[in-house]
Amino acid sequence: MENKINVVMLCGRGQSSNMMFNGIAHHANIVGVIFDNKVSTKIMARRRIKNLGIIKVVGQVSFILINKLLKRVSMSRITQLALSYDLNDAPPHENITTYVDNINDEETINLLKKYNPQAVVVNGTRIISKKVLSSINAPFINTHMGVTPKYRGVHGGYWSLAMNDSENCGVTVHLVDQGIDTGEVLYQGFIQANENDNFNTYPIHQIAKAIPLMKAALDDARNNCISIKEGVLPSRLWYHPTILEYIKHWIQRGVK
């Protein structure tokens, strides 16, 4: 492909970021990858307790702990899906990789100005500050594992199925603003999960669907023809399920 777009990636540390990197690596000229450090569990818990209350958060933490075991059980299915979708989770080469304590640090801004990309691909970071978003003249484009704005927040694929809304089980590629998954929609795609899938395998279907959508968004950015599309309403912010919510939806709807 001629005249590849110059891209910087701002990423969380994890499998989906590596898969996105490798998925677009031959389509774009990725000049730098900046990995965000994970927000501490203590800080996250304090925020959740303030917003949701301690009982809800205890239920969420209980689910997160149980899900570590469920993820181990799901590894064979995850591997199977990654192979079937030809997904590669090898990390980016060290010579283009930088690790920062916080994606909103001055170091990130300095790197963005140094690289001066035509677009910034975002995957799995904390909320990006206005100072970072305005530091360069380039679109910041995020992959969200859910259909926005109806399934903002986390685990949008799971929640759409748990709410008996399988037609809106999908993924969104959108511009980044200062809200939580509130940026304008560029592309959306939908997935088909089956009885072999669960909480830990839905994201594999979603990242596979997202990669070609991100490529299309980068083509639009390269050609200066980004087009905004309507999302799916109503808007709602979702969090981790509690252990009781997870069990309830598994029993009532077979959503694991």
Features from the language model and the residues they span:
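One-carbon transfer enzymes
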Residues: 1-256
